[in-house]
Amino acid sequence: MPELPEVEVTRRGLLPHVVGRRIAAVTVRHRGLRWPVDPQLEMRLAQRVVRRIERRGKYLLLECVSEAAGEPAGWLLVHLGMTGTLRVLPEAPSPGAHDHLDLVLAPGPGAALGTKPGTIVLRFRDPRRFGAILWSTLPEAELPSHPLLRTLGIEPFDPAFDGAWLHRHTRGRSAAIKTVLLAGGIVVGVGNIYASESLFRAGIRPTTPAGRLSRARCDRLAQAVRETLAQAIERGGSTLRDFVGSDGASGYFQLDCLVYDRAGQPCRVCATPVRQIVQGQRSTFYCPNCQH
């Protein structure tokens, strides 16, 4: 499942090709995604210009503005689900069975420098159809109140996210710290791979009740979360099965994993065999010697 690093890699890959371009045509082939695609999406997006691409948690937010006077800006919310990708294509090759939406993008008044002339295609592909493409006309100031965004925790790269924040928001929580990280209500984007890796770097056993973490351990964990996610973004995310970036390239962070998917193999620090357990129906990996 694409997590924060994969979504951020996608966002950064789209920026130089998509921002400033005009949506010349929209093709929706399958509307039955996680939530039905707006039946009027083609009309709503027609001739709008993509002004910005932001990210909130695992959602991509494309701000689409109209050149018509008085028409408010809108936001295309994209969630990649478990197997979704957004690809930039120089032309529109014949679609496959899982290619659900195309945006044909023509050069616009503010197209980024260095992009190729002529039209390009932004294609959404999702074999399992757990992704989502939604339209919202909420003003930017009210966008955090969108039903899909309002319960999300702080961004891990927000300066306010630190050990003090983590310590304060885990008080009274009896759930295991890995479970709390995956829930996303305290901090977003720490998916299954990155939770195991962050907890290893912080020296914290994933079954530790969140409310029992000391301030010092929260300091280490907050730093480990930021470092792990930053490294994953630098490596293009993790490709375990389906994920590719906007240019079709796979991610390579999985090659750097210290404990994830290494059950029975020696810990890279102490050589103790890595253990695998199940928490909330998700596999967890840890070193019983390095993590307490």
Swiss-Prot record:
Sequence positions that bind DNA: H98, R128, R173
Cofactor(s) needed for function: Zn(2+)
One Pfam family named in its UniProt record: H2TH
Cofactor remark: Binds 1 zinc ion per subunit.
Keyword Ribosomal protein on entry: no
Keywords: DNA damage, DNA repair, DNA-binding, Glycosidase, Hydrolase, Lyase, Metal-binding, Multifunctional enzyme, Zinc, Zinc-finger
Segments forming FPG-type zinc fingers: 258-292
E.C. number: 3.2.2.23, 4.2.99.18
UniProt-listed GO biological process terms: base-excision repair
Catalysed conversion reaction: Hydrolysis of DNA containing ring-opened 7-methylguanine residues, releasing 2,6-diamino-4-hydroxy-5-(N-methyl)formamidopyrimidine; 2'-deoxyribonucleotide-(2'-deoxyribose 5'-phosphate)-2'-deoxyribonucleotide-DNA = a 3'-end 2'-deoxyribonucleotide-(2,3-dehydro-2,3-deoxyribose 5'-phosphate)-DNA + a 5'-end 5'-phospho-2'-deoxyribonucleoside-DNA + H(+)
Sequence similarity: Belongs to the FPG family.
Summary of subunit composition and partner proteins: Monomer.
HAMAP family: Fapy_DNA_glycosyl
Function of the protein: Involved in base excision repair of DNA damaged by oxidation or by mutagenic agents. Acts as a DNA glycosylase that recognizes and removes damaged bases. Has a preference for oxidized purines, such as 7,8-dihydro-8-oxoguanine (8-oxoG). Has AP (apurinic/apyrimidinic) lyase activity and introduces nicks in the DNA strand. Cleaves the DNA backbone by beta-delta elimination to generate a single-strand break at the site of the removed base with both 3'- and 5'-phosphates.
The protein, known as: Formamidopyrimidine-DNA glycosylase
